């Protein structure tokens, strides 16, 4: 029977309990005999791209989906039985609990199929599952019927029955909130109290004598070990809640034989663990609120810096409540924490100290974050990079390209007209080096479509170094500001009529050239600084314009990455340049940190490639 809460037949199945290695191709091979399939999707984690253990299969015809549900449910796939049910698009139907029953005290050998076979006689089952962990069945399960009447009939018939020689409990499913509310209501009416820190010589009779004054007791028990010795705690169960409450009030904290007794409401282990967990979480949240915005994380510390030196370096920016350098075996681990008394002081310290050289290393200073927060931020950054990579049609886009040492901008030439250079020497256009104080020379630009020609009386002389120029121009050029281009002093152009013209907006410079200059034409190349050869310091980086800082770092990163991953050097460099500049400087100084980041980038690229493979298969 096809269950649909919306009035039209469904053709979509939910397939759960999948092996982590199951792919769309395996599911297609498994389910295609049932009928034509429109789509298959294995749900995966957004960050790791690992399977979440379930999938959705859309058939063309509802009858085919129903056939697959009836004939393939609980069949084995890669050594695991799969669980199939109708895909319910309405979450309200799944979460309402209508028709859902809870079964506990199940025998270990009862699995999903056995539970399904047992309860299928009462009506159509939408879902059936036995809760399991790494050790097997946890002894309880759930069966979701299509109707409330079928669920009620199953409860009336099966509750208290024997399944594999075990008496099972069957009842309506209750959410955790409902169960906790019931436990809270029962806790207010407790009659059983827990007593600990008893003297060793106190037995059941002694415990009864201590509590008999408060009312009638139904049972008294002192817990003992295997050898019969008292474990110094026990239980007292009263007939009425008021009597138990009175005993707790008067006996908790009372001294007996030199020991202070503890008396309180008896709790189950799970209840105690949940209460302790709530207390721990509350303490954790209080501590986080107390240190929110005032605790700083400091890394790349010099080995000579200890707690006192760390406090001294940060003390000018405010009142420090604690300063700690993390150590292992008495040696610094290279990072620590500084806690200020106010967020304003912490913000000032981050602004002033981040990137400052203390000892021999530049510090990295930022607000301390919890592991969960860091993981969320890294996941968000990964997803942003992933979405960017998806939009790139050209795999080379977004990559960092190692800039050529010099290039000539391409100038369009008329197809039927030869290009000639002027009488002045032509110098290859080159960006001004950023790491020297040498100012760029004045630039000269040609309007679009202008051709550099000589009058017809001068014989054609090709440039001497045109091959090297062409080779350089094939590399991907960097965008160069107009003020950094090298001028071709003395170059002028003439139109077809022989009338001299010059670049608009610039005065015409006189050309004083001998005929020998035309016959012995040479290209004079200035000295070229190869970028990335000199060390990059924090002061050099700070002195550079903001838009050039990443380029300066990239020029030094690219050769290092190219030595490790030749094919992916451009992409990896582009990904690493998204990191903060202070961290990039640390990576340039520390090969270990750089290689670790390279490995992370390679993992991201491989994950993206693995994600694209199923799409290629589907198409």
Swiss-Prot record:
Indicate the segments forming the PABC domain, all copies.
Answer: 533-610
Tell me where it mainly resides: cytoplasm
Q: Name one GO cellular component term.
A: extracellular exosome
Superkingdom per UniProt: Eukaryota
Q: Where does the UniProt annotation locate this protein?
A: Cytoplasm
Cross-referenced Pfam families, in alphabetical order? MLLE, RRM_1
Q: Which Gene3D superfamilies match?
A: 3.30.70.330, c-terminal domain of poly(a) binding protein
Expression (tissue specificity): Expressed in ovary and testis. Also expressed in pancreas, liver and thymus, and at lower levels in other somatic tissues including brain and lung.
Domain RRM span(s) in chain numbering = 11-89, 99-175, 191-268, 294-370
According to the record, mutating residue 179 to Q results in:
In OZEMA22; likely pathogenic; severely decreased expression, if any, in patient cells; loss of PABPC1, CCNB1 and BMP15 mRNAs binding
Which keywords has UniProt assigned to this entry? Cytoplasm, Differentiation, Disease variant, Oogenesis, Repeat, RNA-binding
Q: Name one GO molecular function term.
A: mRNA 3'-UTR binding
Region Disordered, as annotated, extends over 431-458
Residue runs in coiled coils: none
Under InterPro entries, the record lists: Nucleotide-bd_a/b_plait_sf, PABP-dom, PABP_1234, PABP_HYD_C, PABP_RRM1, RBD_domain_sf, RRM2_I_PABPs, RRM_dom
What does this protein's UniProt record list under function? Poly(A)-binding protein involved in oocyte maturation and early embryo development. It is required for cytosolic mRNA polyadenylation and translational activation of maternally stored mRNA in oocytes.
> Which family does the UniProt entry place this protein in?
Belongs to the polyadenylate-binding protein type-1 family.
Illness: Oocyte/zygote/embryo maturation arrest 22: An autosomal recessive, female infertility disorder characterized by oocyte maturation arrest, primarily at the germinal vesicle or metaphase I stages. In some cases, oocyte reaching the metaphase II stage can be fertilized, but embryo development is arrested before the 4-cell stage.
Protein's UniProt name: Polyadenylate-binding protein 1-like
Name its species. Homo sapiens
